[in-house]
């Protein structure tokens, strides 16, 4: 069974599917669905997932409810599909770019820097989609939508932990450091950057966040890791 963090990496490695002309109608239908889901994710990033209904989205897109029902049979199905679309956008902008780098501290830092850049680029109208829905569902009763949201949060934390381990295996970070603890601290720093940006629109938080993260990693770096990072610097 694939571990959660590996699912994010698998998405990042996935190649686009090539269709022949016989699939033209299906491709057009998929393109329409993707456009709807992009709008749904933007709307949910502002208003939350609970307010995302077939009727609300139909009003936003100036479409008929029956037209949306052709793509999504229920509110829950729409919500789950919206989370999936947001996840794919997150993987494309945050997880995928650093996959070509060798395992180690450089790749870990690149992953985190891409995460911070994703916050700043505001891929969604309301800022980070997952920051919004995580806060929304934090105290909600368990249901299918909440479980998927919480699993996505766990996946990214797991990915950070895996990258810390790989940096340890590469000799860049102290092997006695607890990967889960360091991943937790890195996640907390990144989340603080996003909160500062969303609440105060203070761009200085990005530089502060990068410096804080770099210092935290420097504390746990090995001498060999410091030398390798210095050699790789432009």
Predicted regions: what they are:
Residues 30-38, 45, 50-51, 62, ...:
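An amphipathic alpha-helix adjacent to DNA-recognition modules
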Residues 107, 122-144:
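Amphipathic alpha-helical segments used for helix-helix packing
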Residues 1-23, 110-117, 154-170, 180, ...:
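C-terminal peripheral helix-coil segments that are non-catalytic and often amphipathic
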């Amino acid at each position: 069974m694939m571990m959660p963090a590996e699912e994010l990496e698998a998405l990042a490695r996935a190649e686009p599917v090539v269709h022949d002309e016989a699939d033209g109608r299906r491709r057009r239908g998929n393109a329409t669905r993707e456009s709807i889901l992009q709008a749904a994710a933007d709307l949910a990033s502002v208003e939350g997932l609970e307010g995302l209904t077939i009727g609300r989205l139909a009003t936003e897109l100036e479409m008929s409810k029956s037209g949306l029902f052709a793509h999504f049979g229920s509110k829950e199905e729409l919500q789950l599909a919206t989370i999936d679309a947001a996840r794919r956008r997150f993987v494309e902008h945050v997880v995928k770019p650093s996959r070509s780098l060798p395992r180690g501290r450089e790749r870990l830092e690149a992953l985190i820097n891409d995460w911070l850049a994703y916050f700043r680029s505001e891929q969604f109208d309301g800022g980070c989609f997952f920051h919004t829905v995580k806060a929304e569902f934090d105290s909600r009763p368990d249901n299918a939508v909440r479980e998927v949201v919480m699993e996505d949060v766990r996946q990214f934390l797991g990915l950070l932990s895996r990258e810390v381990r790989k940096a340890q295996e590469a000799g860049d970070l102290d092997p006695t450091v607890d990967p889960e603890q360091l991943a937790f601290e890195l996640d907390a720093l990144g989340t603080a950057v996003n909160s500062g940006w969303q609440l105060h629109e203070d761009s200085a938080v990005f530089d502060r966040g990068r410096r804080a993260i770099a210092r935290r990693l420097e504390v746990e770096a090995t001498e060999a890791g410091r030398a390798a990072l210095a050699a790789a610097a432009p």
